[in-house]
Amino acid sequence: TNAQDGVSSVQTAEGALTEVHSMLQRMNELAVQAANGTNAESDRQAIQDEIDQLTTEIDRVAETTKFNEIYLLKGDKGTKTINLEAHDAGLKGTLTNNGDGTATFTMDAIKTGDKVAIGGKTYTIGSTVDEAKALIKAPATGTVDVQIGDKTFKIDNTGKVMDADGNQLYVETKDGQTAAATFSATSNLTTTQKFNNDQGVATDNRAVSVDNLKSYVKGGVTVKVGTESATAMTDVAGAADGVDDNDVTLITKQKAYELAGKELLAANSIGDTEGHASVKNGDDTDLAFDKGDGSFKINVAQAKVANTLSFNLHVGSDADLTNKIQVNIDTMNSDFLGIKGLNVKDENGSAATYAVDAIADAVAKVSSQRSALGAVQNRLEHTIDNLDNVVENT
């Protein structure tokens, strides 16, 4: 009967998709393996070779699976452009898919001293020397602990500077003259102060000040005040490139935004056969080390695919249109699944990590199509049972 033919056609398509599903699961295993940092270049190449073969086989299954000369998984005549899913590249923040081929991503707030993971690497957000100095100040109430490099101090709410044990610090001149006459406000501190007040000089002129402490701060020094911290970058002027001269993991906040934008582009370019993917700052400016505020505009990847195959199964004995059951099957090639040209070969495994997300999207598409076909098959089986019942009792 027509209904039985319908069941057979749906089972043919669903059986082929079972194999596609299995291949995607294997690709996921390979991508996870490639994301591990222990792989040598030859290992990743071997993994890439297998992924390429699996992608080719998925395309072959989509191209050749047919029932009664009807190709079930290659779509229908004509083409359409589809938007692929947006991805956050593993960054901490909020991703919003706008549904129109664009998405927005806003990073969680970052501040000086924070550790930020971008593209498989961990960076510390640095500051200028002046920004680090600005942390050193008297608290509104009580006392605050201050660490400058390897030196520890306390400052109370009156601005009094003390050592770690709470003893007030004083400047003692080498020649016994009064501090007021010989001390320059921010240049005479040594690395091992043991200040005292045994010279008989007025303490108001000799007490160490908050400004004196700030003189310790220079490029490469970390300042911790209470729960806040800042590492002064060695290229004080905000950096010609946003990266510390002596430590490539110490970067400015704006440099972090630039790097994040580049990773967003890498994650959202997978499967982009139409060249649509792009990432800009939230204010629509291009990514740069001295721009950005942590918000991004994403044009998602796009692919051109065949139109959805649609056909009707006529399961009744009369011409009533309610006797028709519609079957819709999307093309299931690598373009539609968003895995065309999938790459896992970069050095730090971030490409493989992004590939895992792309494969997950592909699995979701196959699962959705299998679910739809399963629903049609169940309906057809009930239809057949009811037709048998009508014949038997008529």
Predicted regions and their residues:
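Primary detection of the long, small/polar-rich alpha-helical "axial" segments characteristic
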Residues: 1-394
